[in-house]
């Protein structure tokens, strides 16, 4: 009898074991296969925490799991041994709203590891009317683009139909809504006109923009009083937006410009982002500690203010920014008329030669004409000037440098230039602040085709890898974890991108894999059209756009709509 009991007990144990195997196999079979597992990586999650070893699994465009995934079924494996696995980089200020229609892959962006861009600096891609399209016709024709949208809803629909190589969000520009109502004239809006402008901001926020922006150095933006900007920012605030600004002055009156930005934030009840924070002009070098102290004091008092930087010592803007604001009244055509008129030209020269706190006089900020390099032109006749210094152009044409500047603008008021006017210690100090993220402040471009014909600031190709190479690896002014936080979690939190910017389960799988010992920028001021190296894999929404260091051509990007979006 005891033998029978023993046999029965053994049989039961065997049956239980077999049942366990069967159930385990069934459960394993029911577990969805992962699309991709990244193994053995040094995971830097974006929060600033130290790296750790682990695997990362992706399914249906999102991060499905992080940990030991050695037993997980998958369609593909990427071995990231010795490499960093990090969140995709977020560009806090890009300019790709037009170039993404020319080459939606945006090679210059993705080879830096950029997976998301926030665009729309003051003069945004929408709203549009016939007068603006006619005024900006040369730019559209340069890129062979037909503007078949009038609103952000229509523009975003065009992007989604075409396909996008990165994720893209946009501000509605305060300059743009001003142009819609007032044109390019130096005048103040009536109450009815201001209400029209506010209505345009409301519509843009419903269309999915993330906030309202200003570029207060570039006409017609300087004509706007602070009260006008508060009114527009208030509308964006109602929809959960942010106010971002290229401030009215970044040189002698930089502290007063910060005060204006803080006032707008305070009275409109809206967060403030100061774009490409800097102290420009040799006479102002060494003043970044004052800027940092002012912002730290504001933050300590409760102001929701932060900033970003591209960490180069040269800026890049329209050549026409050297001209006093009054001369821009009426737009580019009127500016050209004034530059052709000897009397008005002499007045412009006089204003540029006189230091002033009434406007950001860039001519007073440069050490000389050798500090200006021609970067982009829309008039093909000026193409031979690309990459040349103003001093060289003036000498070869037997002109005074200021006359050479005026004559270039007469031929092409859209000319853009690189200006060497910042100090390295100021740039480094700004970069080190915990509330400073990173911006590219450039359009996405390519070394090939029509986009490769310009001579951009090297930041267009190199900002993020340059920070990893110069400021992390070589100079050690940032830790790798700090840099990745500035590239990802910090901007995601600032822009309220709640499902991006950090590596954790449930987030969209925007992921970069690179070797921290070798990643670097290649673009220089003399030869800027060079892709950065070192990004071995870049995934956007789980889809590789760079695979083993090569561009795939995939267009998995999404429009990133703001909190006020109404479908």
What is the role of each PLM region?
Residues 41, 341, 429-435, 441, ...:
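C-terminal cap of metal-dependent C-N hydrolases
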Residues 13-25:
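Bacterial N-terminal signal peptides
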Residues 2-16:
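Bacterial N-terminal signal peptides that target proteins for export
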Residues 72, 77-150:
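Metal-associated gating/positioning segment near the N- to mid-region
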Residues 156-159, 164-191, 195-218, 229, ...:
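Active-site neighborhoods of metal-dependent hydrolases
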Residues 35, 43-55, 416-427, 475-484, ...:
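Acidic, glycine-enriched loop/beta-strand segments at the rims
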Residues 31-34, 43-88, 103:
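Histidine-rich, glycine-flanked metal-binding segment
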Residues 27-29:
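Boundary at the C-terminal end of the N-terminal hydrophobic targeting segment
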């Amino acid at each position: 009898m005891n033998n029978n009991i023993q046999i029965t007990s053994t049989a039961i144990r065997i049956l239980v074991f077999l049942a366990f195997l069967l159930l385990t196999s069934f459960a394993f079979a029911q577990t969805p296969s992962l699309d991709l597992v990244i193994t053995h990586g040094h995971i830097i999650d974006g929060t600033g925490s130290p790296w750790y070893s682990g695997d990362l699994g992706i399914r249906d465009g999102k991060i499905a799991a992080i940990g030991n995934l050695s037993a997980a079924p998958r369609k593909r494996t990427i071995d990231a041994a010795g490499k960093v696995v990090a969140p995709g980089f977020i560009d806090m200020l890009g300019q790709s709203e037009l170039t993404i229609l020319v080459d939606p892959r945006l090679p210059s962006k993705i080879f830096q590891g950029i997976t998301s861009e926030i665009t729309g600096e003051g003069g945004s891609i929408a709203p549009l009317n016939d007068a603006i399209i006619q005024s900006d016709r040369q730019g559209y024709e340069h890129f062979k683009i037909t503007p078949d949208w009038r609103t952000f809803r229509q523009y975003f629909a065009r992007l989604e139909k075409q396909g996008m190589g990165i994720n893209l969000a946009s501000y509605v520009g305060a300059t743009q809504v001003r142009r819609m109502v007032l044109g390019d004239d130096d005048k103040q809006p009536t109450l009815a006109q201001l209400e029209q402008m506010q209505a345009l901001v409301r519509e843009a926020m419903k269309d999915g923009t993330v906030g309202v922006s200003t570029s207060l150095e570039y006409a017609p933006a300087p004509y706007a009083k602070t009260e006008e900007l508060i009114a527009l920012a208030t509308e964006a605030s109602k929809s959960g937006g942010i106010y971002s600004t290229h401030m009215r002055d970044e040189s002698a009156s930089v502290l007063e410009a910060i005060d204006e930005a803080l006032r707008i934030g305070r009275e409109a009840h809206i967060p403030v982002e100061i774009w490409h924070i800097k102290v420009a002009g040799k006479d102002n070098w060494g003043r970044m500690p004052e800027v940092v102290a002012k912002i730290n004091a504001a933050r300590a008092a409760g102001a929701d203010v932060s900033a970003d930087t591209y960490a180069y010592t040269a800026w890049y803007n329209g050549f026409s920014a050297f001209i006093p604001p009054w001369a821009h009244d009426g737009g580019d055509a009127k500016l050209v008329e004034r530059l052709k008129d000897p009397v008005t030209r002499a007045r412009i020269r006089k204003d540029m030669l006189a230091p002033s706190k009434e406007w950001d006089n860039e001519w007073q900020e440069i050490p000389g004409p050798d500090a200006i390099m021609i970067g982009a032109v829309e008039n093909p006749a000026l193409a031979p000037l690309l990459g040349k210094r103003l001093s060289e152009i003036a000498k070869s044409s037997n002109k005074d440098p200021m006359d050479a500047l005026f004559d270039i603008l007469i031929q092409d008021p859209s000319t853009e230039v690189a200006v060497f006017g910042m100090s390295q210690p100021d740039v480094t100090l700004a970069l080190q602040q915990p509330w400073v993220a990173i911006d590219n402040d450039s359009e996405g471009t390519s070394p090939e085709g029509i986009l490769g014909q310009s001579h951009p600031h090297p930041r267009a190709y190199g900002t993020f890898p340059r920070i990893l190479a110069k400021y992390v690896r070589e100079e050690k002014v940032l830790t790798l974890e700090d840099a990745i936080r500035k590239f990802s979690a910090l901007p995601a939190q600032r822009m309220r991108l709640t499902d991006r910017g950090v590596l954790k389960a449930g987030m969209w799988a925007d992921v970069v894999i690179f070797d921290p010992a070798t990643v670097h920028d290649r673009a220089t001021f003399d030869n800027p059209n060079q892709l950065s190296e070192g990004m071995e894999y870049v995934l956007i929404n789980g889809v590789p756009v760079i695979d083993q260091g090569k561009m795939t051509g995939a267009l998995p990007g999404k429009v990133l709509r703001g909190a006020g979006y109404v479908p």
